[in-house]
Amino acid sequence: MSVFSDLPLVIEPSDLAPRLGAPELILVDLTSAARYAEGHIPGARFVDPKRTQWGQPPAPGLLPAKADLEALFGELGHRPEATYVVYDDEGGGWAGRFIWLLDVIGHHHYHYLNGGLPAWIADAQALDREVPAPVGGPLPLTLHDEPSATREYLQSRLGAADLAVWDARNPSEYAGTKVLAAKAGHVPGAINFEWTAGMDPARALRIRADIAEVLEDLGITPDKEVITHCQTHHRSGFTYLVAKALGYPRVKGYAGSWSEWGNHPDTPVEV
């Protein structure tokens, strides 16, 4: 049995610190190359956040090529018995997107370090500069559709009583006053709750303690299918993570996000 098996999805520095030597642990740092070089959690392997995305217009947030994912997870030493702990330094956007990737490859043994590197540092935990070597070459992966919503799927679900579209962008993008695509505004019926509003800056960017009640009041509830997006499914990595951490049973990331929806000729929008 894993030493992580009794822990919730979201863990604290005090949970991780005594488990850093666990043989099943793959610790993933999604900060930046510069931040990682300055000091990271001991044993952490750096993943450039850009490697979690397709990176090409018009929808850079789509999944990377399967071969690129197989190379990435080979470097990390992916194996069925592994437990991932994932962190970043921005409150959970990139870490949440990586957790979405783990769901896509069908691997569900994972945790998010609440608050990420800022919380680890605030708790006076140790940092290291040692860089672990890549473990191996490409590994064959099976990609699963369930964690993802395509544009066509989202469009087919619009208006359903059991759907909540969680728009993680800022209010000006949602309202259409800030335009980052051919079309401005939002997906019809979408609920706007900006990703950073779910973080507590007084607690080193940890997920705010009342997030379940906030989402309930907004109508983003566990009885609905929650499809979350932003511009490139980076910010909505955090909102995907939050819904998963709260135990919502039907959560999907719309990886195309507004960069796809807002540039497609056949998508409806509201302002």
Swiss-Prot record:
- The active site is formed by 230 (cysteine persulfide intermediate)
Gene3D superfamilies, per database record: Rhodanese-like domain
Establish whether keyword Ubl conjugation is in the entry: no
Question: What is its induction behaviour?
Answer: Is constitutively expressed during the entire growth cycle. Expression increases during exponential growth to attain a maximum level at the onset of the stationary phase, slightly decreasing thereafter.
Q: What is catalysed by this protein?
A: thiosulfate + hydrogen cyanide = thiocyanate + sulfite + 2 H(+)
Q: Which domain of life is it from?
A: Bacteria
Q: What happens when the gene is disrupted?
A: The growth of a rhdA-deletion mutant is impaired under cyanogenic conditions and fully restored upon complementation with rhdA. When P.aeruginosa cultures are treated with exogenous cyanide, only minor differences in viability between the rhdA-deletion mutant and the wild-type are observed.
Q: What does this protein do?
A: Catalyzes the sulfur transfer reaction from thiosulfate to cyanide, thus converting cyanide to the less toxic thiocyanate. Contributes to P.aeruginosa survival under cyanogenic conditions, and thus provides the bacterium with a defense mechanism against endogenous cyanide toxicity. Is the main cytoplasmic rhodanese in P.aeruginosa, accounting for 90% of total rhodanese activity.
Q: How is it used?
A: Microbial rhodaneses may contribute to cyanide detoxification in natural environments.
Q: Name one Pfam family in it.
A: Rhodanese
Temperature sensitivity of activity: Optimum temperature is 20-32 degrees Celsius.
Instruction: Tell me a GO biological process for this protein.
Output: response to toxic substance
Write down what this protein is called: Thiosulfate sulfurtransferase
| Species this protein is from | Pseudomonas aeruginosa (strain ATCC 15692 / DSM 22644 / CIP 104116 / JCM 14847 / LMG 12228 / 1C / PRS 101 / PAO1)
Going by the record, the broad EC class of this enzyme is: transferase
Q: What is its EC number?
A: 2.8.1.1
What GO cellular component is one of the record's annotations?
cytoplasm
Keywords annotated in UniProt: Cytoplasm, Detoxification, Repeat, Transferase
